[in-house]
Amino acid sequence: MVSHEENTSIVEWFLGPHPYTYPPYGIEMIHEDDEVAVAHHHHHHQSGEYYREYEDHRSSDVDNDEIIARTLQDDFLQLEIAESNDYSHQNQQQQHQQEGYTNNYSNNNNGYAWNDQSPAVDYSSEWIGNDNDQDGRSDDSVNVFSCSSPSDTDEYVYSWESDQCDADGEFGRRLNQMVPIPYIPKINGEIPPEEEAVSDHERLRNRLEMFDFTEVKVPGDGNCQFRALADQLYKTADRHKHVRRQIVKQLKSRPDSYQGYVPMDFSDYLRKMSRSGEWGDHVTLQAAADAYRVKIVVLTSFKDTCYIEILPTSQESKGVIFLSFWAEVHYNAIYLNRDTSETELQRKRKWWRFGN
């Protein structure tokens, strides 16, 4: 088990004041119970939006220390490499068999090769945004790819709009099996004590393993939510300042949609959120979902909440991004392992540090 010093380092890693968080209207809460499966079904409509809360039921009894977590990540990497090699080997065998059959068929059928009519695969993407950035592309552009996009693409947003993308995955099956119950918005509690924070970290690690996610850790400098969003949207956490500006811009553009969930004067809230280092909350997450037209899935460490799903309120989502939320104080970007290339896994592995 982790020592007292390691536990302390985990908690002390995060800096900055505790944020107030008032979850807005486009949020789905998924709950987790340790013993009995509870199924309720009820929709609560408020301000034109739905609140849905799900119950999932799994025990959280895995050991959580640095060695096990890193070993788990190594296992993910080795599994990914092994599956990739096996898939490549199978493809080569199939290709050789197909080529042999095609040659024989062509010789006997006036040179006609039936496999030349293979269907074309469209890997096109859609860009969102119009302001020019220094790198020559749209400053607020987000590359949104479909489920069929190549896994080694540099920039993409996972798409949840098609059932076939997640139908074969454990994560998609778990989502489809959950049943909604009412959710009432509330302000987040206090920062948990050290012992509870360590327990939350253990619970989050278990859920990351259960849903087969890889975590990309970002600094705990007060900008973690915006860094995690930037990593998902632009594939670099360094664009967190731009993401913050876009979110504040969205908040300003629709004050009537957000100010009712802020426990202070809305103009003061906007000024606070405009400052670098100011913690993001569920209101800023909702604004991010609206501004970028994406669904945001937040895997949490809460005892009774497995994950939160935040939907754009006025437009159809163009894709989905994933974050983790630990002990009410820190966000990281997370990626489904099956959608991550070997190169991308190795890059994320360098980011994965504990107690820093």
UniProtKB/Swiss-Prot annotation:
Enzyme type, top EC level: hydrolase
Region Disordered, residue ranges: 86-117
KW Magnesium (keyword) present: no
Catalytic activities: Thiol-dependent hydrolysis of ester, thioester, amide, peptide and isopeptide bonds formed by the C-terminal Gly of ubiquitin (a 76-residue protein attached to proteins as an intracellular targeting signal)
Every OTU domain range: 213-337
Enzyme Commission (EC) number: 3.4.19.12
Biased composition (Low complexity): 89-115
Protein's UniProt name: OVARIAN TUMOR DOMAIN-containing deubiquitinating enzyme 10
Source organism of this protein record: Arabidopsis thaliana
Organism ancestry: Eukaryota, Viridiplantae, Streptophyta, Embryophyta, Tracheophyta
Gene: OTU10
